[in-house]
Amino acid sequence: MRILLSNDDGVHAPGIQTLAKALREFADVQVVAPDRNRSGASNSLTLESSLRTFTFENGDIAVQMGTPTDCVYLGVNALMRPRPDIVVSGINAGPNLGDDVIYSGTVAAAMEGRHLGFPALAVSLDGHKHYDTAAAVTCSILRALCKEPLRTGRILNINVPDLPLDQIKGIRVTRCGTRHPADQVIPQQDPRGNTLYWIGPPGGKCDAGPGTDFAAVDEGYVSITPLHVDLTAHSAQYVVSDWLNSVGVGTQW
């Protein structure tokens, strides 16, 4: 199995390094990751400037100022030859649950892999300690995929409780929960008296009941949520169409 491995925490982050070491025991792994933390970069691409890369002695490649999506795009289309069999993103430091998937560079890297035609996993740890647990879970899933491919055409968003492996209760297939809107902005002043702003933490849990990714992780289970990129609200198409007809928009300007 050939694996393109990326993340949004940066090429030196403990999550990606722990996972790369574990994966290399049974797979051919090419790390292509940002040279710095790009958390929250979502699916952004660098279009207004060129991208430079740096290759370390162990073969890992850092993309200077690159986004997670840049890294996967370059990895698939230029840097990994032969091309990978699968794209894996992670292990993220902290969860990507519910609405987090909209902003997550970890999930975005997996989405880019899927967009380019490859199976893809996004892996996150609900904390900053037991990366070895998340690596073991990921390796188990990838070994299973080697034996029997999962042809859903979907991204698997995997969130792992920050627990020792022997305390993980199992795996649940879940849906994305939701968070309350984030509303905190943290102002500071620079030495010249100018105001600076920091984006605050994400909103608290809103829909976090049974069946959600939040609930699974809180209860000690690995959460696997299949994701797709069709953002069309199909059930709303008729509502919008009826509304346009009723108000006359499009029949006269």
From Swiss-Prot:
It catalyses: a ribonucleoside 5'-phosphate + H2O = a ribonucleoside + phosphate; a ribonucleoside 3'-phosphate + H2O = a ribonucleoside + phosphate; [phosphate](n) + H2O = [phosphate](n-1) + phosphate + H(+). A divalent metal cation binds at D8, D9, S39, N92. Binds 1 divalent metal cation per subunit. It comes from the Bacteria. The keyword Zinc does not apply. SUPFAM superfamilies: SurE-like. The keyword Transmembrane does not apply. Its EC number is 3.1.3.5, 3.1.3.6, 3.6.1.11. It is found in: Cytoplasm. Its cofactor is a divalent metal cation. It holds the Pfam family SurE. It is an enzyme of class 3 (hydrolase). GO terms for molecular function: 3'-nucleotidase activity; 5'-nucleotidase activity; exopolyphosphatase activity; metal ion binding; nucleotide binding. One of its GO terms (cellular component) is cytoplasm. Keywords: Cytoplasm, Hydrolase, Metal-binding, Nucleotide-binding. Nucleotidase with a broad substrate specificity as it can dephosphorylate various ribo- and deoxyribonucleoside 5'-monophosphates and ribonucleoside 3'-monophosphates with highest affinity to 3'-AMP. Also hydrolyzes polyphosphate (exopolyphosphatase activity) with the preference for short-chain-length substrates (P20-25). Might be involved in the regulation of dNTP and NTP pools, and in the turnover of 3'-mononucleotides produced by numerous intracellular RNases (T1, T2, and F) during the degradation of various RNAs. Belongs to the SurE nucleotidase family. NCBIfam families: PRK00346.1-1 (NF001488), PRK00346.1-3 (NF001489), PRK00346.1-4 (NF001490), surE (TIGR00087). This is 5'/3'-nucleotidase SurE. It comes from Escherichia coli O7:K1 (strain IAI39 / ExPEC).
